[in-house]
Each structure stands twice: as structure tokens, then as C-alpha cells.
Amino acid sequence: VLGQGNLNAQVVIVGGSPGYNEDLAGTPFVGKAGDLMEDFFSAVGVSREDVYLLNVVGCWPTETAIPKKKRNPTRGEIKACVDLAYRTIEIIDPYVLLLLGSVALKTMTRDTRTINKIAKDDRIPVLTSYTRGLQVDVPRAAFATLHPTALLQKWDRSDGGAVDLALRTWHRAFQVADKHSQLYKGTTPRFGT
């Protein structure tokens, strides 16, 4: 499943790997997780067409003994695919990465915290070390939060706080991208504040 979206995006949203629904559709972030993302897009005042979506690993890592069961990609799978993800980000040249889940966090940054620790931190961290593996001249901003699939699982357990924090992280990521556009590209505010 290749990345899709706006090649001039200021925000690239990175997940770990596609799931069963994405594999069938050939599109990143569809199904229930995609529906939640659409709600987040609406809440921050953007659409799928405003961003670029990709996964660190383009193939659906599956357990062959259990149909439709997903697992995290192995180090070997990440190593085989990550250069394509890095190159895609270099070409798009966004100012902000929004990292969804632990695979995206660990692959795109040098941050050693777990995604759950970041998600529970009420301060909405900005991860400034987004340049891991990338050839970029300008420091970038990276924000990390739980993947929509994890949020749906937490929501089912009545943990609305994780969803609220994720939405605040999304808002902050788009605010930073908008501010960057205003300062360096002379544009007017684009994203919801």
C-alpha cells in the first residue's frame, strides 16, 4: 500500500503498516481507523486531500495462521521498507510529521519513550529530532500520538482521555504547520486554530 495525498502537503501523517482493510483497498488509513481519522480531519478543519498519508512499511504484516490478524512489522520488514518512506518524505518536504503509533515513532525519531507514555503525557510533546534517516536541511517538527486503531480500542474501554489528547495533538500539529506556512511562505492561515 503506497502513500497517498497532497505532494505539496505541510503535514505528512505516518503510520506503522497497513492493515487488512488497507491491503484490500490499496489505500492507507481506511476502515474504522480511517473513519476516526476523517473525524479528526474534520475537527482540525482539513481533509485527506490536504495531507500526505503513508506507512513506514507498505505491506500488511499478517499472521498467516490467523486470517485478518495484524502484527507489528519486524525489524527486517522495517529495514526493507523504510528507505521508501524516508525518500517520500524528502520529496514532499513537509514541515510537520504526525506520527501515529510506536512503529512510526521509533522509525522516524530518536525518541526512546513508548507511544503510550507520550500519549499519557498531557503536554503534547514536540519531537524535534525528526531527521533520523532523512536528508533534510531544515529542522522539522514531529508530533506523536496513538494510532487510530489503538484509540478505537481504548475508546471501547471508555478511555476518552486518550482520544481527547490525540485530537489536541492533531490540532497542535496543524497549528505549527500553519504558522510555518505563514512565516516562511507568506501564506494566510490555512488550518483551523
Task: Enumerate the predicted regions with their spans.
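A polyanion-binding, active-site-adjacent surface
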Residues: V1-T193
